[in-house]
Amino acid sequence: KKLYLNSLSVVGINPKNHDIRFVEDDWESPTLGAAGLGWEVWCDGMEITQFTYFQQMAGYECKPVSVEITYCLERVCMFTQQQKNVYDLLWNDEGVKYKEVFHQAEKEFSAYNFEHANIDDLLKMFDMHESEAKSLVEKKISLPAYDQCLKASHVFNILDARGVISVAQRTGYIGRIRDITKGVAEIWLSSQTK
């Protein structure tokens, strides 16, 4: 905790001048069969960091437990640059703003994900990535299998954003991805113990 608070000082946020709170926020990724204890760190009421102690991955206990510290860099910069809007952040010393770098991509990907993604093609892509991942798991090729699993998960997220997956279907899709993840973990762990 002390090391983390010192890191805030290094980037220009003096913890003595702000209301810093550690708020319990355990993490879970059902598609990955992953979970862990976690905390959000709030600065003056806004989340700026997430701590996660990964205790389970693909349904397996993590030994040892690993930790991830995720700084919400844009939010940290909002404090250090004293900005209320992320798009007003300076991106570089030449005066280029965050909006100039990222706004178009955010608009276009939002339009794609929520309005224009071809549902029929995405359903086929999900099946294709799932099939490829299963085939690679059978061949005991873990990393490309995991890559295909991540692609299937990404397609699932777009389908979910489009609102085409019912509650019952959602559970089924999550289970399908988790099954692949577990298979990948089994062959990975097996390869590491040889």
Task: Give names to the regions the model predicted.
Residues 1-192:
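Structured aminoacyl-transfer and RNA-binding surfaces used for tRNA recognition/handling
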